[in-house]
């Protein structure tokens, strides 16, 4: 949200990755209770955390307006917009110009989320198939001037394969 990013930038942060945006479609319903779960070891030491939040449930147009306002007010700070849309070229072609209009500094392709969105053919459902990673990354690079960061899923046996696919597709990072 603009409020949170503004507070961060006023505190001196140099950049942010905006919460993952999606295209218009079936509504996203996030949980209203605790968003994180703890994984405890046998000795009750904290081993890790797991979140259960999906992509933003806020309308795309509100996020785009807020990103544009933040970039106007903080032109020297980096704003990378995280994206997760269906694995269809038309969906990526439609959203990329909207992101460019905000003056964002880059896009992150969210191929990592293992829950909630994989059932819709997004997130880790893309990140687990190197051919999809390469294909979508290439679409983004062909249709946008923005630097492209590919966020991969850890839910795969060999992360090198999708990483190499992202590189072949033209990812900047």
Residue locations for each model-derived region?
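N-terminal capping/small domains of soluble enzymes
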Residues: 1-80, 84-89, 93
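Alpha/beta enzyme core
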Residues: 6-11, 15, 72, 86-173
């Amino acid at each position: 949200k603009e409020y949170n990013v503004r507070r961060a930038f006023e505190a001196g942060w140099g950049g942010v990755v905006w919460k993952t945006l999606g295209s218009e479609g079936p509504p996203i319903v996030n949980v209203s209770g605790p968003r994180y779960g703890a994984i405890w070891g046998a000795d009750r030491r904290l081993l890790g955390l797991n979140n259960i939040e999906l992509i933003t449930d806020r309308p795309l147009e509100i996020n785009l307006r807020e990103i544009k306002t933040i970039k106007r007010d903080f032109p020297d700070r980096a704003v990378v917009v995280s994206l997760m849309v269906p694995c269809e070229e038309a969906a990526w072609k439609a959203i990329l110009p909207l992101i460019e209009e905000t003056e964002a500094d880059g896009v992150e392709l969210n191929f990592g989320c293992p829950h909630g969105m994989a059932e819709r053919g997004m997130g880790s459902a893309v990140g687990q198939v190197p051919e999809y990673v390469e294909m979508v990354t290439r679409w983004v690079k062909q249709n946008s001037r923005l630097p492209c960061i590919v966020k991969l899923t850890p839910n795969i046996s060999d992360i090198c394969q999708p990483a190499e696919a992202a590189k072949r597709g033209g990812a900047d990072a």
